[in-house]
A protein has these predicted regions:
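A compositional/biophysical signature of low hydrophobicity enriched in polar/charged and small residues
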Residues: 1-72
Length: 72
């Protein structure tokens, strides 16, 4: 299993709710600070992480993302 956290910058207030609609995102919630939302992901491969982050970046209003992958 590969676990990752994707930080999302977006001026859209409901970005966390939109993230929940993305396939394979386990959880998402709004945060304060440099980013506006967090998406928690747990998948089988690194390639799936790339696919999910690409899908997130296509959401209208997403300005940038930063992905952190669990190191074991």
């Amino acid at each position: 299993m590969v676990r990752a956290i994707v930080l999302v910058k977006s001026p859209k207030k409901l970005i966390a709710a939109r993230l929940k609609r993305v396939n394979l995102i386990d959880e998402s919630f709004p945060v304060s600070g440099q980013f506006d939302a967090v998406a928690m992901i747990q998948v089988e491969s690194l390639a799936q992480i790339k696919d999910i982050t690409t899908e997130i970046q296509k959401i209208n209003g997403v300005e940038r993302t930063e992905t952190m992958i669990e190191v074991q």
